[in-house]
């Protein structure tokens, strides 16, 4: 009886047979494939960025956090390459030119840049996740998305330590 009341409440207010705000995040699979390809192509630049961060600190805790994030990025790259292959049947070549040219040697400013990048990527992963054709692929992307949110929290922590 309680479940029926709960169900009727949501039907009354227009939430039945659809996921809340689903239309905002429902995306085309082709768009998701383009985003995945771009994320894979940007991987080398991301690793260079983390190498720069490591070179700007000598704090043991900061180094451990940054290395943990780098390990997650390696895992994400493998998952994305696998997803790209499963969705397209093609492997991406990694012989592109790197565009990473950051001479900004300020640790805090680079942490802020990293935080902004992680938050921007959450939007991309949300788009990818909503376009996945099956639950296994959706869960793979969800794992990356939750890692991105965790990374953003770590960046906030490291930035706060710099103040």
Functional labels for PLM-detected ranges:
Residues 1-163:
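Non-heme di-metal
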């Amino acid at each position: 009886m309680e479940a029926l009341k709960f169900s009727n409440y949501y039907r009354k207010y227009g939430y039945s047979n659809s996921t809340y705000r689903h239309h905002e995040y429902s995306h085309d699979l082709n768009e998701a494939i383009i985003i995945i390809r771009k994320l894979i192509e940007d991987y080398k630049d991301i690793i260079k960025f983390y190498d720069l961060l490591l070179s700007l600190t000598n704090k043991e805790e900061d180094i451990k956090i940054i290395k943990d994030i780098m390990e997650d990025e390696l895992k994400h790259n493998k998952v994305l390459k696998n997803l790209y292959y499963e969705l397209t049947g093609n492997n991406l070549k990694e012989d592109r030119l790197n565009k990473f040219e950051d001479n900004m040697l300020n640790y805090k400013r680079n942490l802020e840049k990293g935080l902004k990048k992680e938050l921007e990527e959450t939007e991309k992963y949300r788009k990818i996740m909503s376009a996945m054709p099956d639950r296994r692929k959706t869960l793979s992307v969800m794992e990356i998305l939750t890692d991105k949110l965790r990374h953003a929290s770590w960046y906030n922590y490291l930035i706060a330590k710099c103040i």
